[in-house]
Amino acid sequence: MKDDATGADFLLSGYDYELPEDRIAQHPPVERGLSRLLVLDRTTGERIHARFADLAEHLPEGALLVANNSKVLPARLLGHRPTGGKVEFLLLTPLPLVTPLAAGPASGTVEPGWCVAEVEGLLRASKPLRPGDTLSFGDDLRVEVVHKGEFGRSMVLLFWRGELATLFAREGHLPLPPYIRRADGDEDRDRYQTVFAREDRLGSVAAPTAGLHFTPSLRETLTARGHQWAEVTLYVGYGTFSPVRCADIRDHAMHREYVEVTAETVEAIRRAKADGRPVVAVGTTSCRVLEGVATAKGTLEPYAGWTDIFMYPGYTFKVVDHLITNFHLPESSLLMLVSAFAGRERVLATYREAIEEGYRFFSYGDAMLLR
């Protein structure tokens, strides 16, 4: 589907809306799955207020649901300089792509038993950091600044001793979004992961939040109703949450993210399309994988690599027929993606109604089904 885009659709200001602070969910629901669902018919504009637990009632027969199976890494490290000053580092490179360097000048001085890799991350410190500065995060993790980029993004040498995932699990914090105004806690270790998350897909720096609403029992219900499942991988990184700063959104450059689509998933989608069954993307990350690969390759095919696709009104969707998603931040690339799918004015009108009806917004908030 392609919406006829207008000049207003390309203005960043066209994606602004007022959101009362108390509509931003600070905690997950008491139980997983106790979320609301706002169903939007993107052709007629009809809106239905429902429960997410009743999702099966609102899906077309035989739908293929495609979910992101990446798992959130406790990627936020709190440490200090040699002088004692506090620093913070958020690893952006997907964990499976952190490859130890061979011994040589690029790897610096590596002590026996230690590994080193060049990675990308976000750095914050009370005083400016410079190339060559060394930062410590416990006894077995440290970072040396290589190059500082814009908005805190930096290339660094990451030094570690032991198993890297274990070290992050021990020393790291879940990188909750800044609009959640509290420290991460024990509940987030479970509730900020989806039921689709796989240990061998550990490395996202934010949850694919549409998946947070699903429970094992809901998956069983959907399967019993004749719906099918497929998975893709997108390691959620800077591209998903970096702000759009251009007055004309067409000038925005997305930061790339690493994705994987298996032959099994491609075949499941081909069968669904051949049978006339809809493909339902569980979240904008799943949507970005499918559309990113199909756009880059001309068709959907098995793929492991990067995507920097940016969808906004005027984009023609090639794979995704329906979309399950949360409510997104004003002026964000994700709101633009949803607007590309259902029309900017229709989406913003739906958001206004959701605010009036008391829906919870953003990562731990309620969901929409756009069909």
Curated annotation (Swiss-Prot):
Q: Which GO terms describe its cellular component?
A: cytoplasm
Cytoplasm keyword on record: yes
Gene Ontology molecular function terms on file: S-adenosylmethionine:tRNA ribosyltransferase-isomerase activity
What this protein is reported to do is described as: Transfers and isomerizes the ribose moiety from AdoMet to the 7-aminomethyl group of 7-deazaguanine (preQ1-tRNA) to give epoxyqueuosine (oQ-tRNA).
Instruction: State the InterPro entries in the record.
Output: QueA (IPR003699), QueA_dom1 (IPR042118), QueA_dom2 (IPR042119), QueA_sf (IPR036100)
Location(s), subcellular: Cytoplasm
What highest taxon heads this organism's lineage? Bacteria
One of its GO biological process terms is: tRNA wobble guanine modification
* Subunit comment: Monomer.
Q: Top enzyme class of this protein? A: transferase
**What is the gene name?**
queA
Q: What is this protein called?
A: S-adenosylmethionine:tRNA ribosyltransferase-isomerase
Gene3D superfamilies, per database record: QueA-like (3.40.1780.10)
Q: Which reaction does it catalyse?
A: 7-aminomethyl-7-carbaguanosine(34) in tRNA + S-adenosyl-L-methionine = epoxyqueuosine(34) in tRNA + adenine + L-methionine + 2 H(+)
Pfam families (UniProt xref): Queuosine_synth
Q: What is its EC number?
A: 2.4.99.17
Q: Which family does it belong to?
A: Belongs to the QueA family.
Q: Which UniProt keywords apply?
A: Cytoplasm, Queuosine biosynthesis, S-adenosyl-L-methionine, Transferase
Q: Which organism is it from?
A: Nitratidesulfovibrio vulgaris (strain DP4)
